[in-house]
UniProtKB/Swiss-Prot annotation:
Binds to DNA and alters its conformation. May be involved in regulation of gene expression, nucleoid organization and DNA protection. Its main location: cytoplasm. GO terms for cellular component: bacterial nucleoid; cytosol. Homodimer. HAMAP family: DNA_YbaB_EbfC. This is Nucleoid-associated protein PC1_1077. InterPro entries: YbaB-like_sf (IPR036894), YbaB/EbfC (IPR004401). It holds the Pfam family YbaB_DNA_bd. Keywords: Cytoplasm, DNA-binding. It is found in: Cytoplasm, Nucleoid. Belongs to the YbaB/EbfC family. GO terms for molecular function: DNA binding. SUPFAM superfamilies: YbaB-like.
Length: 109
């Protein structure tokens, strides 16, 4: 099934992938992404662990109704979370792109 040295090569690839994944997870944890809503009137910056680092609200929104502001804040946070998820998915794909996996083997992402 694996041929000569195939299992050894597969184990080596798995170890390399594990190291790359750990490095990628550290990179994503340190990454900061800003999500926006209301055409940039509300901005929320979160890190890769989804911890909020900064909230910016345009002063013009302070005069509007509270409910709209709350909706814009939630939308900005969701935008930032989506951007983190996309970045994480791209980095995971880059980690696994060079591996020669056995037929039918699928990565968990």
């Amino acid at each position: 099934m694996f041929g000569k040295g195939g299992i050894g090569n597969l184990m080596k690839q798995a170890q390399q992938m594990q190291e790359k994944m750990q490095q990628m997870q550290e990179e994503v944890a340190n990454l900061e992404v800003t999500g926006e809503s209301g055409a940039g009137l509300v901005k929320i910056t979160i890190n890769g662990a989804h911890n909020c680092r900064r909230v910016e609200i345009d002063p013009s929104l302070m005069e509007d109704d509270k409910e709209m502001l709350e909706d814009l804040i939630a939308a900005a946070f969701n935008d930032a979370a989506r951007r983190i998820a996309e970045t994480q998915k791209e980095k995971m794909a880059a980690v696994s792109s060079g591996m020669q996996l056995p037929p039918g083997f699928k990565m968990p992402f």
